[in-house]
């Protein structure tokens, strides 16, 4: 549980109070009352909390020493810029970013999100039965949120069960946008720093420079397969093993299937893999609805140009009980996420401060400069 403590050195900052959770100090705005820690990751700790002003339950994520690693600081900045613009019921809402006391020297960032109960990874590994209706509804919401992102020109690039938050009503929301990019920035980023390996599309594993929205569709296919089978479909141990597992299931690729590979070494590697007829998805998921298998087959296609799009997936017969085209408006404007990858820490800190101001119009310039 959260325990209230005295401020460090007995010197508290106005408008803040202090709690410890899991040996971590939280310095948070007095309107938030923490309840208990609910998650821990490489970034820091998440706790549930109540906003006293609105009586709403929220999740507070503390990112410790955010500027110690410049790449991680850029990820955080990118997520803040993106979430300020996104408004969709299947995308997590960022409700607040707490203003630090010192503009030029703050080290930690506190993000306030809507509170969800669990994530899809926890549900999949639990003993809770998942019916066809559950799988269908989770997939529908994931596709719906993704269609909104793609309509804004955003690739998520890190979809996996742990980044899909779920509540007790089975509502699903996509989170963790630190690796998201706009669709018009081709070949500019390290491919290796994209998508957890098990959910990574073949074109990323093969180091192809030109990738697009279809990388997210592949990840959705892997997540859907995991929902159906309660275990990862391609749990590769490293990059080449990952490709091998994919080919083992999909079967040996024809010349036409590998035409898109612009890396000669990668193309050669695929050709050296021993012949395999593949494994029918119907035998891997014998309990699955036939239409679910049909849609899964269309998502897990090796050649990205032949892979189903998000809109086509929503229009697939498996989704027809849930999909209403008129209820899926696109994002209002494409979002510009262009951030100079070479920014220094001081500039990243200043840009984060500017993002925070959007949530705090009451903060007057000139205070705590």
From Swiss-Prot:
Gene Ontology MF term list: ATP binding; MAP kinase activity; protein serine kinase activity; protein serine/threonine kinase activity
Active-site residues (renumbered): 158 (proton acceptor)
Reaction catalysis annotation: L-seryl-[protein] + ATP = O-phospho-L-seryl-[protein] + ADP + H(+); L-threonyl-[protein] + ATP = O-phospho-L-threonyl-[protein] + ADP + H(+)
PTM sites of type Phosphothreonine: 191
InterPro entries recorded: Kinase-like_dom_sf, MAP_kinase, MAP_kinase_CS, Prot_kinase_dom, Protein_kinase_ATP_BS, Ser/Thr_kinase_AS
Domain Protein kinase: 32-319
Keywords: ATP-binding, Kinase, Nucleotide-binding, Phosphoprotein, Serine/threonine-protein kinase, Stress response, Transferase
GO cellular component labels: cytoplasm; nucleus
Name this protein carries in UniProt: Mitogen-activated protein kinase 4
Organism listed in the record: Oryza sativa subsp. japonica
Gene this chain is encoded by: MPK4
